[in-house]
Amino acid sequence: QPKEVKWKLMVASCYRRMNDLDKSLKIYEEIYQENPENLECLRFLVQICQQLNIPYEEYNA
C-alpha cells in the first residue's frame, strides 16, 4: 500500500495539515513526477506554491 498514490497523497496531506509545507511540497512534487495527471496532487501543489510565494505555472493544468 505505501507505494500507492492514494497513500502518498494522505502522507503529504498530513504534513500539509501540520503546516510543514516544505515537506508536503516535496512529497506532492514526487507524486507529480510519477503521476502528472493526478488532479488532487496538482491542486495541492498549486495551493502550496501560492502559500510559499513560489512559481507554480509548470503545474497548472
Tell me the role of every PLM-derived stretch.
Residues 32-33:
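Conserved structural position within tetratricopeptide repeats
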